């Protein structure tokens, strides 16, 4: 999967959304939302995310109901991983006499606070010299967040919808990630079965 937007607010939130569906056309069918992870059941945070999903389902014509009487059960799950650290090597042409004059592209070693590592970039003979190095290594953490949504028909237990939205971000804050993943999931809902699409959610306007 390609690396998606890394900024939390400055750039659009990009998510890859996969959906498989056999949903009937909305005709007032009722639904109830439950936590796929029992640890989230009854939680205030889960309730806020479930409310966002309910709003989206109502927009397309479904009606919320209690779990005992609903036509469909919507299972909601979400998570963000521990993240992976990435390094970006920045080069300043003002301090590099070889910038654009015969430098050649190959992997080389730089030393970071986590030890030596290979970095792809332009080789410079002054990299290990006593002069000021024209390179700087930026380190940051990339987190992968996902949202899983399933809809089952209560009468016979038939699976009607399976959807997954996944995004990479420099933020690991669920209150930021989950609402964006919900919006991505319901963009063009229910979608074409078996299709994975890239959804961009515009960043919030600064006030």
For every predicted segment, state its role.
Residues 27-40:
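Acidic/histidine-rich, surface-exposed loop or edge segments in extracytoplasmic proteins
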Residues 60-71, 192-201:
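Surface-exposed patches in mature extracellular/periplasmic domains of secreted proteins
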């Amino acid at each position: 999967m390609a690396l998606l937007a890394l900024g939390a607010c400055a750039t659009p939130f990009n998510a890859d959304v996969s959906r498989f569906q056999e949903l009937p056309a909305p005709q007032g069918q009722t639904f109830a939302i439950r936590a796929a992870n029992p640890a989230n059941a009854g939680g205030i945070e889960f309730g806020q995310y479930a409310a966002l999903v309910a709003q989206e389902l109502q927009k397309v014509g479904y009606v919320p109901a209690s779990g005992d009487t609903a036509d469909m059960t919507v299972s909601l799950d979400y998570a963000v991983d521990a993240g992976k650290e990435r390094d970006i090597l920045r080069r300043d042409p003002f301090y590099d006499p070889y910038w654009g004059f015969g430098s050649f592209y190959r992997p080389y070693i730089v030393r970071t606070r986590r030890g030596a590592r290979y970095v792809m970039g332009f080789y410079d003979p002054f990299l290990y010299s006593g002069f000021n190095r024209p390179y700087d290594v930026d380190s940051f953490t990339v987190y992968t967040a996902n949202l899983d949504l399933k809809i089952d028909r209560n009468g016979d237990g038939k699976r009607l919808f399976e959807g997954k939205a996944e995004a990479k971000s420099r933020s690991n804050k669920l209150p930021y990630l989950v609402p964006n993943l919900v919006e991505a999931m319901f963009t063009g809902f229910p979608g074409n079965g078996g299709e994975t699409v890239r959804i961009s959610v515009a960043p919030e306007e600064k006030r």
